[in-house]
């Protein structure tokens, strides 16, 4: 993938994970370019199918385009930062991300966004005054 494409995806996301909103500047691990529709499921490598993604969200998402809502056990697609508004599906409650919809809850569950260590990291960033990022810069809105 050309470096210019990575730069475009990074700029569009304002340097934040498009799923959990973690700023790249506050994670020691390199961020990934996520195929929203995974390559395993014929997802193309085009800007419209790429999301800037922290390593944790990327690794937990893997090739999954969907998952089960933990409240209803019904299969739902994961959040799509190209076609959906982040604030329609998620909201912050201190360091915990809350799902407002089945898509939000499913995404939080599959990507393990509220794992204890990830919450602890966000609480530290909140204490430092650098999280959550101001909407819309990291939300794609």
Language-model region placement:
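Extended charged
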Residues: 3-4, 12, 23-26, 44, ...
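Short beta-strand-alpha-helix junction that forms the catalytic/metal-binding core
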Residues: 17, 41-61
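Short beta-strand segments
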Residues: 18-20, 28-31, 49-50
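Histidine- and/or cysteine-centered catalytic micro-motif in compact active-site loops
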Residues: 22-23, 36, 41, 57
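Histidine-centered catalytic micro-motifs used for acid/base chemistry in nuclease
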Residues: 30-38, 52-54
């Amino acid at each position: 993938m050309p470096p210019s494409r990575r730069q475009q995806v990074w700029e569009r996301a304002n340097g934040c994970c498009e799923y959990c909103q973690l700023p790249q500047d506050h994670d020691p691990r390199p961020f990934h370019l996520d195929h929203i529709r995974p390559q395993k499921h014929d997802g193309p490598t085009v800007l419209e199918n790429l999301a800037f993604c922290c390593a944790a969200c990327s690794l937990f998402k893997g090739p999954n385009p969907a998952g089960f809502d933990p409240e209803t056990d019904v299969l739902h697609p994961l959040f799509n930062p190209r076609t959906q508004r982040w604030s329609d599906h998620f909201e912050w409650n201190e360091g915990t991300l809350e799902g407002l919809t089945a898509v939000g809850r499913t995404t939080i569950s599959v990507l393990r966004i509220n794992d204890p260590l990830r919450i602890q990291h966000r609480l530290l960033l909140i204490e430092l005054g650098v999280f959550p990022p101001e909407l819309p810069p990291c939300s794609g809105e």
